[in-house]
Amino acid sequence: MADSLDHAPAQANNLPQFLAMTIGAIGVVYGDIGTSPLYAFREALRPFGPDGVERAEVVGLISLMLWTLTIIVTFKYVLFLLRADNDGEGGTLSLLALLMKKAPRYTTLMFMAGILGAALFIGDAMITPALSVLSAVEGLKLVTPAFHDYVLPISVGIMVLLFAVQSRGTGAVSIFFGPITLIWFLVLGAAGVAHIGDDLAILAAFNPVNAVTFLWNAGFVGFIVLGAVFLTVTGAEALYADLGHFGRGPIQAAWFAVVFPALTLNYLGQGALVLSHPEAVSDPFFLMFPNWALLPVVLLATAATIIASQAVITGAFSLVRQAINLGFLPRFEICFTSETQTGQIYLPFVNNALLAGVIVLMFMFGSSESLATAYGISVTGAMVVTTVLAFEFARHQWGWSTLTATAVLLPLLVLELFFLGANLFKIHDGGYVPILIAGTLMTTMWTWRKGVSLLREKTARQDIPLSQFMAMVERKSEHAPVEVPGTAIFLTATPDTTPAVLLHNIKHNHVLHQHNVILTIKTARVPYVPEKDRYTIEKLSDRFSLLELRFGFMDDQNVSRALARCRKEGFKFEIMSTSFYLGRRKLIAAPQSGLPQWQDKLFIAMADSAIDPTEYFHLPPNRVVELGEQVVI
């Protein structure tokens, strides 16, 4: 394990470093929200149909968009949630881990809310790349209609290439993400400035009264339009999830200095263009540019959407890693793609599942216009979950009274529920897709957690207290196991009981090592555990010791490195004369268990698909001994 300082939450120590991290945040954190101008205003205009949209409605729509950005992104995320961190880390599961420690009475409720938020985020990780890249590549149709039939194949090809290079890591190219996205935001702002003068009446959008008046006059149509207006803030969850990568200061600076002004200017420019040229409602973003600039803008937009997609994919990898370490999912293979950056990881199973999902969505919907109807539910749902968890965080971590927390967060929750309600009207048009994805992932995580709990209860009935076992083997008798030289390390989840693999070793091999270490690996409710707190050793007798290794939910659980650190600090053992004993369970579904039969089978399938603990914990393969047992659950 690298020293904890290597992967501590990011902090800028000087101005050049602060500027570099700010530019980096522009590329990674704001890539998704930066691609929203491609389709958000266009989709908001769509419910008004072929009769066209009135001037007051255009101003009202832009006003809604600007104030949604201000309230949801600026107030909730940039100013409020970026302060709600778990030792510098943000994100739904990071917040959940902290709350499960601070408020254990509500563990089940918060667990359900947390895995719902995580499941919705993974659904978003499938939809965002498909929608963003399709939106950008569709600009080619304005360059020449001949590209019409090639938009989908080109988009799918880009996605296949993007997911194919994940195993190589993004360290070499990620240095370009920030500068390219910065150029993208500058182009957004410049395009907006160039068109605001088309009709200065659009500046009335700064007045929130126009947003309220629009909703009041539009009635049910206005409520439906909220679903499209919400597209302006998709990607806001990335601000919070990437808190540990860049730190609060650079993320806030990037928003106020570059991103918010650029988005504001661009939406105002699109609105002014539609006011002066009503026919531009078909594609107000790309029609802002002259013909000679279309191809460069399409290429830049494609690059921006690829970067946005990369940020979402990386976020999904990080989220799944957290879920594994917190015990919400079985162990998947985790590959580290950088020798210096522990946060750069690649999960083959997750990568392949995301790619399959993205391609299926692209072929199902065929265009960004159709896919936009499926978008929004996952994002609004995740935001609602985050607000609920933030309410508990404010009470338990900051000591806010219930009244204060309600006064601050209830208006936000009500607003987000309105957006969620508007998006739910899209269910029949494709909105069912993120619900199905989230439902499947929630069921998977709930099944795994419940199955592991039932398995522990089942095996606990047969457990022998470690103290009782030690007393038994210390007795001199003709049936005592033969002592052999060397050290044996037995992995177990319950240090007070005798590991089943130790009992099996004595039963079948009739031997006991000279030194026996009962090893427990704990995942703390914090992102990273400092090296000084990595382990504790307790000597129980001349033959037995207890060793506990502690890792954070963002740590690489490298047991070999941790043991090497223990050896440096006085824990005497020789790795080449040490054997690691692991238990391998063959699970059998029972007719009567704590889970329905289908869930039993799902849990067993997940357990069978989990990566070998030897590989996951980085144990030396030639020193590992596995003993199996059959367990009926």
From Swiss-Prot:
It catalyses: K(+)(in) + H(+)(in) = K(+)(out) + H(+)(out). It is found in: Cell inner membrane. It comes from the Bacteria. Keywords: Cell inner membrane, Cell membrane, Ion transport, Membrane, Plasmid, Potassium, Potassium transport, Symport, Transmembrane, Transmembrane helix, Transport. GO terms for cellular component: plasma membrane. The chain crosses the membrane at residues 18-38, 61-81, 109-129, 145-165, 173-193, 211-231, 255-275, 287-307, 345-365, 371-391, 405-425, 427-447. Its main location: membrane. InterPro entries: K+_transporter, K_trans_C, K_trans_N, Kup. The keyword Isomerase does not apply. It is a multi-pass membrane protein. One of its GO terms (molecular function) is potassium ion transmembrane transporter activity. Transport of potassium into the cell. Likely operates as a K(+):H(+) symporter. Belongs to the HAK/KUP transporter (TC 2.A.72) family. This is Probable potassium transport system protein Kup 2. The lineage of its organism: Bacteria, Pseudomonadati, Pseudomonadota, Alphaproteobacteria, Hyphomicrobiales. The gene is kup2.
